[in-house]
Amino acid sequence: MAFSFGFSGDDIDDVDAHEAPQPTTTPAPSAFPVPGKPQLPAAAHSLADLLARLPSKVAYSSLSVQLDDGTAVQLPRRELWDVRVQLMAEEDGDAEAAEGLGKHDVKTGVYEGGFKSWESSVDLVKVLAADPSVTGPRTSPLSVMELGCGTALPSLALFQWAMAIDAPDRGPTSFVVADYNPTVLQLVTLPNFVLAWALHHRHSPLLQEAFTLDGELELTPDVLQAFQAYLASSKISLSFISGAWSPEFVQLLYAAQPARTASSLALVLGAETIYSPFALQAFTEVVFDVLNRERAAPESSAAALVAAKRLYFGVGGSLDDFVDKAQSKGAVTSTLREETEGVRRGVVRCVLGTSDGAAPAN
């Protein structure tokens, strides 16, 4: 099923009335980002390995995002109740992952929100939709790095727009999606990409047979092989990284991407990633590591698009704090979107200034 929303709460809550009761779990002793506690090291995950661990079918719904031009983009998402069923069915049920399937939002040290779709990620989709350099035809490479991706709505939108461009008019496109929790990548991020591809090609005989009347997609070996074949033939790469933000994390970001030989655009995306001072510091360091690497690369341009609440009550992060940190590091920032109804939110663009202090052109 599909639905639109005009939300004013903290997150996009699509809890189905038919969901099973939430399991009782013991909170995990630690999770990113908590100062002084062990963090998961950064790790890359191959597409083939993650595909091999998918269930035989996934249930999904579509989120209808109303854009500023009056149109809408439909973004598929695996149902949370379907994720819960999979976790409960697995012998080594992941208590930490199940903790993320309740109705709460961020609980520092326990759950960081990866299974949910957040308001700011939708704000970021709206900003990207208004930028023809990423939605329309292009011959130069595009590199997308989404940090703290969760359900990866911004990357999913870019993926769908890339699929809609004729192959001769689409330059190489790479997506590196990263979440601290590898279970999030396995259970929601990758399934959402497969769903987006399948729905875009749903009229093919293979996929007509794979979609069920109950709102499910059967992930047969033929379907998964066709997904991989499409990526390879379309010059689209999809890579996954888990673990804490760190210099090693940035090294994996670049190791995961194909070599870029022509002028290219790199986008760093982050939605709801700066909700505490500790998270803000780690996120900002990674963003500037990437921006500095891109500035050193020939014929490359880069920008970070950061979407967040103006203030995270009780945990200490804020969008204004990110802007202050970015400007103190010599970046040029601009506000691309403001939301004042309900929880105040914004989207800012961050680029490194030129030697004369001006922002580089797109």
Question: Language model features by range: what are they?
Answer:
Residues 1-362:
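S-adenosylmethionine-dependent methyltransferases
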